[in-house]
Amino acid sequence: MKNFLTTLLLIFAVQSCFLPASVDAEGLPTKVPLIKLEYPGKPKNIRMLYVKILSLGNRTVNQPLLLDTGSSGMTIDCKSVLPAETCSDTGIKITQDQQIDGIMVTTEAAVMNYGTYDEYGNVAYARVTFGSPDSPVSTITSIPFLIRYKTVNRSTGEIVGGPLWPKGNFGISPVGGGGPDQMIKSPMAYVSVGPGLHRGYYLSPIGTKWTVCTNEDGNCPQVEALHIGVPKDVKKDFRVQRWKQTNWRYNFPTLDSCLSWGSEPICRPTLYDTGNSTIMVVTDASKPRTSLKTGTKVLVKTDGQEDWNFTTTYNPEVEIVPGLEHNIVGIRYFEKNSLLFDFETREIGLRLGH
């Protein structure tokens, strides 16, 4: 009965977040600061964005998680949430569902899939608060997420991790989900917005300057680039179209894009992904993995969008990946350009140059 009632509440919460917004005077989007991080060491130029989780339930967390437009649902490392003695590589040491500081930790196991890695953990429920302490954003109800106890390389079975690995993922794709019956969905599906705004969000340019830093040292710069709530006057600056979920297995929407560099264009459904440090282009599974040389001029043509031209500045920045099913446009795009999702109209939009 408890699970049935929880499911009903979650369905109501998600549906309410996709209802039309109020027609009152238009409010302002909520700005969420993002942490810009370039990892130290080798390989160089691994660049990511993070959003800080302030609290889960009644528990203060203050844990940055990887911001990922290419997945849906939140995961967080066990030791960031629960007592260390509860966490191990073999599982979370509980024998029954437990309420801990407003977090319902269940015994239900789940696996979340990311590229070549899988995250194992338990389903939990809590109200999530994230962003800036000065202007925090909270989900309107407790939401499901994964407390992970290990991350595994899918091809080798090796448990991976360490100080410089993300302590979890903040997946904000508006489609799909993870865990049983895709129940673990984007926290953005449970966030309300100001009057007159469409539910959704947009990412403004994060800038081209990067700093080698770590979340552990707390020395990374921040940029207010995530905006929750879509105003009409902002949306009109984007070229928008209905989003596509090309394959039911994809936990992300795609656009039909072609990438070329003085050769035949490579056209595939394309993910615009903050969670990927490089740009990845499809090639035949029998070919080797390669990358473009520094100084290569690249053209990205997308149906219904302006052409995006750029020149590679390091290697690997554009990788040619055998067996990949879709193209991935990674963090380079977000330095000077914008991405928008309107949940109410189910539209995706790009804006070049600002």
Regions found by a protein language model. Give the residues of each.
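Bacterial N-terminal signal peptides
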Residues: 7-16
